[in-house]
Structure formats: C-alpha cells, structure tokens
Regions:
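Extended, low-complexity, turn-rich repeat/linker tracts enriched in Gly/Pro/Ser/Thr and Asp/Glu
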Residues: 116-133, 145-146, 220-223
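Short beta-strands within extracellular/lumenal beta-sheet-rich domains
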Residues: 87-103, 191-199, 228-230
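Surface-exposed, low-complexity/disordered Ser/Thr/Gly/Pro/Asn-rich loops and linkers
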Residues: 64-94
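Bacterial Sec-dependent N-terminal signal peptides
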Residues: 15-34
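A short beta-strand element within beta-rich, extracytoplasmic domains
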Residues: 106-123, 214-216
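Beta-strand-rich interaction/scaffold domains
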Residues: 136-183
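Noncatalytic modules at the cell exterior or secretory-pathway interfaces
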Residues: 201-216
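Short beta-strand-plus-loop segments that form exposed binding edges in beta-rich domains
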Residues: 176-181, 189-196, 213-222
Length: 240
C-alpha cells in the first residue's frame, strides 16, 4: 500500500485530478476529486469546535464566508474564508463534504493536497504559540459525518482528529500554515499528505459514503483567518 500511496500522490502532482484510472495489472483502482473554490462552494459546509460550551460563541468571532480571496492573490476569485479568535487555545475550524457512490464498507487509501492563503510568517511570535507554526492544517475522512457535539462542557468533534500537532484516527497533519518569513500580507501555500510515511485509510459506510474534512487546529491564542482556494483528493482501492 505504501507504493500505491506514492503512486497516488504522483498523480496529484502531475495534475490528473478529475480523471479515473483503472489498472488491471495490479488490481488497484485510482480516482480523484478536485475542488476549485474560485468556481463554486461545491457543497462544502463549515463548522467550529474545541471551545467551551458555556461561553458566548460571539467572543470567539467565528466567521465563514464564500467570498473573494485577498486582492493581491487575484481579482474576483472566490474562496472559502474561515476565521476565529482562539481564546480556548485549541480552536478547530473545519470544512466538510460528503462523497457518494463509493463501494459500501470498503477501505480506501486517500492522498490530500490543499491550497490556501495565509498571512502568518514563519518565525512569528504570538500568545500561546506562533500564528503560523502553531496552527496545524489537517485533512481526513470518515464514514460518519463530522459534527459538533457537546462533551465535558466543550464543543467537540464527534470523530478523532487528534489534537493540534498530533494526527488522529480520522485526520492527519499536513503541516502548519506559516508563509515565508519576509511575506507581507497573504500568500498562497500548498500542503499535502506526502509528509506522512503511511497512507491514510478510511472505510466507507454501508451506503458507500464518506465525508472529507479539512481544517486548522490551533495552539495560537489569537485570530486566524485563512482562505481555502483548492482541495484535491486522490482515492485508491483494490479492484479485485
């Protein structure tokens, strides 16, 4: 499967998103989903977790908008903007989308590539941690819809995403959201799952569905605002 994982990511890098490949020689089927937010929101939904349930949510300044990206990154180009003020030192801001028509109860290896705009330079210092290097980008998937729940008086996530720099069963860390040190304003960055040694495996549910999840897990006690511009996900599974 590790070899297959490398093959999948090679396909991402060579720009074959949206295609479907079927290799009869090794019994591996590979297909992909590409989401370009300059064109549409494409049924992605947004939510926030990891903050106290007994606190007025307005204090966290939680915001989502399908809106234009920062002007220096291209005029009239839309993006998914998520923003929040991390008073809890653990805010998770995420997007999710259901994928259908998969084989039921089947394991899939997934590879992720996420492009987003950040304004947090590498080496910057903030309360609780760095605005860039203490905010971790995660990607994952689950056969159960990711939802906000209340647990121990906290708004929590109902699936295991890990915590901050640690991956969980249903999500892996792709890196942080820092941009180069000399950057002024927003810049586009790309993070991918090739940083992980092992492939990410998810099992579809009995209806042949999974939910993709992309988000930031923050240890920086301040405001983080990011603009997601593109998500590519490559699936592979045995065709035997």
């Amino acid at each position: 499967m590790k070899t297959c994982g490398k093959l999948i990511f090679f396909i991402v890098l060579t720009g074959l998103c949206g295609c479907e490949l079927n290799s009869d020689s090794n019994g591996i089927m590979v297909f992909s989903y590409g989401f370009d937010f300059s064109k549409s929101q494409d049924n992605w939904a947004v939510d926030f977790t990891d903050f106290p349930a007994d606190t007025d949510p307005s204090a966290y300044e939680l915001e989502f908008a399908y809106t234009e990206r920062p002007a220096n990154l291209g005029a009239n180009k839309k993006s998914m903007m998520l923003s929040g003020n991390n008073h809890s030192d653990d805010l998770f801001m995420f997007m999710k989308r259901k994928i259908t028509d998969l084989s039921p109860n089947t394991d899939y290896a997934l590879a992720f590539e996420v492009e987003l705009a950040s304004n947090a330079p590498k080496g910057s210092v903030g309360i609780g941690g760095s605005p860039g290097q203490s905010v971790f980008l995660k990607a994952g998937a689950s056969g159960t819809e990711p939802k906000q729940i209340i647990e121990d008086n906290q708004y929590a996530l109902n699936i295991d995403k890990g915590n901050q720099s640690t991956s969980g069963q249903m999500a892996v860390v792709l890196g942080d959201i820092s941009v180069p040190e000399e950057t002024e304003g927003y810049a586009l960055i790309t993070r991918n799952s090739d940083v992980n040694a092992d492939p990410f495996i998810v099992r579809s549910n009995s209806k042949g569905e999974i939910w993709l999840i992309i988000g930031t897990d923050s240890g920086f006690e301040g405001t983080t605002t990011v603009y997601y511009t593109r998500v590519n996900v490559i699936f592979s599974t045995s065709s035997n």
